[in-house]
């Protein structure tokens, strides 16, 4: 149980997928202008990321490893993720049109979100079992959502203040992203302390 708590805390704060591992930068910068849109994107990513990790883990263990096709991992995972996003989009459109309308614009963007592919590969590299993979994927999605929503809040506040001409646009956005990254660096070493505390070291 403690091992899963460690994975959960580490994935959200210590090794945040965006601010520490620099995956998913495109949606982080592109969909973070408003809190509403960032929450919608976060929900869509959480759903697809968790589902994609389960499917890609099963593909790796029961297809690629069994038939010695590990060299096809990246292309296989990309195809699985793209197919999964399309399937989710079709199902949502039929089952829940309201939810489809809310997330519709974000779902196609998830296919190109490198964080989804990155997490799928990371769980294989870390040799996680299926439950650990699910916990890691969901925790990573929460970490992504947290970073995205906090950053959207910062950008909304920046709209209310007068920024010097030379710092307007992407300059202040990149500076704010850097400061947010530095804030999350304050969590570095927490996972090591928790390992000792939980007796996992």
Protein language model annotation of sequence segments:
Residues 61-104:
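Ordered, amphipathic secondary-structure segments that act as subunit-interaction surfaces
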Residues 23-37, 85-99, 151-162:
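C-terminal ends of transmembrane helices
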Residues 3, 183-201:
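Juxtamembrane boundary at the C-terminal end of a transmembrane helix
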Residues 7, 14, 45, 50-54, ...:
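Hydrophobic core segments of alpha-helical transmembrane domains in multi-pass membrane transport
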Residues 1-5, 58-71, 121-132:
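Helix-coil boundary and interhelical linker segments in multi-pass alpha-helical membrane proteins
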Residues 36-47, 71-77, 99-110, 164-171:
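Cytoplasmic-side transmembrane-helix entry/capping segments in multi-pass membrane proteins
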Residues 4-19, 68-83, 135-147:
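Structural signature of hydrophobic alpha-helical transmembrane segments
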Residues 22-30, 89-95, 104-107, 114-127:
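Generic transmembrane alpha-helix signature in multi-pass membrane proteins
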